[in-house]
């Protein structure tokens, strides 16, 4: 009985340690797996709208990336910083002209923010799209004119092993 209990406890610990790691996800070869999503940095310098269209074409349910907590922010900061360091990077956050609220392109709720000090400032009433700021190692956000050219980060939720 003691061995069975010990083995069961060990399996439970392994299961909990793997949960949330993306260990059971199928991300394409060159995409980062984190939590329940896959991410990829694209180096083409494009407008926010072009980046969003490109992401949608890459994978089923793909969008520009949305960031929902500090852990995800740090993971993506490290990922981008290891590959890039020159330009700000588009993410999926955009100011709705309809209601003046910042919204994620994937429709998820804006539950976490990491704006640079004094941002968003909507300079000259022309900054409706958000970037991960190169000057903060991609940890903080800035609002920018949507027609500026930047690399971008796509995200999608893959099928799990069980659903594959």
Curated annotation (Swiss-Prot):
GO MF: carbohydrate binding; metal ion binding
Tissue: Expressed by the venom gland.
Residues making up the signal peptide according to the UniProt record: 1-23
SUPFAM superfamilies: C-type lectin-like
Glycan attachment sites: 35, 109
Localization in the cell: Secreted
Major place of residence: secreted
Superkingdom of origin organism: Eukaryota
Residues at which Ca(2+) binds: 127, 142-143
All residue ranges annotated as the C-type lectin domain in the record: 34-155
Keyword set, alphabetical order: Calcium, Disulfide bond, Glycoprotein, Lectin, Metal-binding, Secreted, Signal
Cellular component GO terms, alphabetical: extracellular region
Cystine connections: 27-38, 55-154, 129-146
Residue numbers covered by motif Mannose-binding: 119-121
Family recorded in the similarity comment: Belongs to the true venom lectin family.
Function: Mannose-binding lectin which recognizes specific carbohydrate structures and agglutinates a variety of animal cells by binding to cell-surface glycoproteins and glycolipids. May be a calcium-dependent lectin.
PANTHER family attached to this UniProt entry: MANNOSE, PHOSPHOLIPASE, LECTIN RECEPTOR RELATED
Protein name: C-type lectin 1
């Amino acid at each position: 009985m003691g061995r069975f209990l010990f083995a069961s406890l060990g399996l439970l610990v392994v299961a909990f340690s793997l949960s949330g790691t993306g260990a059971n996800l199928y991300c394409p070869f060159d995409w980062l797996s984190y939590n329940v999503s896959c991410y990829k940095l694209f180096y083409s310098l494009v407008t926010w709208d072009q980046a969003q269209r490109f992401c949608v074409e890459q994978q089923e349910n793909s969008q520009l990336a949305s960031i929902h907590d500090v852990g995800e922010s740090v993971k993506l900061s490290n990922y981008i910083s290891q590959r890039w360091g020159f330009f700000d990077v588009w993410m999926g956050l955009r100011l709705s002209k309809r209601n003046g609220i910042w919204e994620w392109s994937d429709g998820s709720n804006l539950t976490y923010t990491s704006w640079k000090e004094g941002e968003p400032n909507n300079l000259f009433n022309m900054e409706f799209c958000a970037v991960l700021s190169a000057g903060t190692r991609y940890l903080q956000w800035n609002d920018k004119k949507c027609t500026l050219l930047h690399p971008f980060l796509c995200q999608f939720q893959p099928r799990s092993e069980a659903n594959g």
